Amino acid sequence: MKKKDYYEVLGVSKTASEQEIRQAYRKLAKQYHPDLNKSPDAHDKMVEINEAADVLLDKDKRKQYDQFGHRAFDNSSGFSSNFTDFEDLFSNMGSSGFSSFTNIFSDFFGSNKSDYQRSTKGQSVSIDIYLTFKELLFGVDKIIELDLLTNCSACFGSGAESNSDINICNNCHGTGEVLVQKNMGFFQFQQSAKCNVCNGAGKIIKNKCKNCKGKGKYLERKKIEVNIPKGIRPNQQIKLSQKGHASTNNGVNGDLIIDIYLKESKVFEIINNNDILMTYNISYLDSILGNEIIIKTLDGDIKYKLPKSINSNEAIIINNKGLYKSINKDKRGDLIIKVNIVVPKNLTKKEKELIEQIYEQTSFNPENNINQ
């Protein structure tokens, strides 16, 4: 069966950034994860999504894929017959699960637990948090709510009504695996496969837990407090270990990955990594007279003595009032204020008379040279 294009699988363009690919993967993973999606094709779809993300989120693999397509990772072209010994033969059978001839027996018989029974880490969860400029600057504590797979409190994740309802699978004798015979050319060998009776669990549940209907887990709405420290930047991540979905076979929970984004602002902008640029309106009279004004900033009100005759688009620099240069440290960038001189559209009769008197007495004339 012909494989789908990895970019099509994730629904992104071939020029998509790593962030766009990561966001597309998270969206699809939430939609098709078998623990959340019970449709019969969810498992195969999730395998396809994981395979595509594994390649496209790895710079080297993506480069190979863009150049050669699926052929770059095609291991199905057969096996060479020019082996020097049996160890060479089995070391090349990457698809059989054996790393070399010397550990065939340990793969068959040396483990008390199959891959299907081993504890596995729970699925990690990714969420996006959008911060205001003030929250980004000073840090903030957020309470987030999300649905997480949690081990059943009644059966503690076993899925059984009681311990006596858990029986060893007679087909695989509790290993979760059975041996199947494979033919490859002139060679015949055995390979372990997941037991189709117990689905790799190694056990059969007689009476299922009524609380979780035998699943061992259920979705539970949880509130989680997230501390976002000062000094964090947009597009950075915070990882809360073991705050994700519950694990399988008593493994550790997955992680909660928080992607930080900045809400759009009409006032503030980040420049030079650590500086904050803001536009501030100033009265035309304050600019002419060089008055002391109150500038409202994210740090609060700041008194500032204007230089006389400051013009629009000139910058006022207030040191150490920008972003924190690193997480939970006190060194900061600068606040750069771009001045915008505001002239009133409506004047009182008295104001207009006074300005006309000044106009009649002034010799000021701004230069305009159209030949420059």
UniProtKB/Swiss-Prot annotation:
* GO biological processes: chaperone cofactor-dependent protein refolding; DNA replication; protein refolding; response to heat
Q: Which cofactor does it need?
A: Zn(2+)
Positions of CR-type zinc fingers: 139-221
Annotated ranges, domain J: 5-69
As for subcellular location, the record says:
Cytoplasm
The entry's Zn(2+) 1-binding residues are 152, 155, 209, 212
One Pfam family here: DnaJ_CXXCXGXG
One GO term in the molecular function aspect is: ATP binding
**Ranges of the CXXCXGXG motif repeats in the UniProt entry:** 152-159, 169-176, 195-202, 209-216
Cofactor binding, per record: Binds 2 Zn(2+) ions per monomer.
Q: How does it assemble?
A: Homodimer.
For domains, the record's comment is: The J domain is necessary and sufficient to stimulate DnaK ATPase activity. Zinc center 1 plays an important role in the autonomous, DnaK-independent chaperone activity of DnaJ. Zinc center 2 is essential for interaction with DnaK and for DnaJ activity.
Q: Give the family per the record.
A: Belongs to the DnaJ family.
Identification of the protein by name: Chaperone protein DnaJ
Name the gene.
Answer: dnaJ
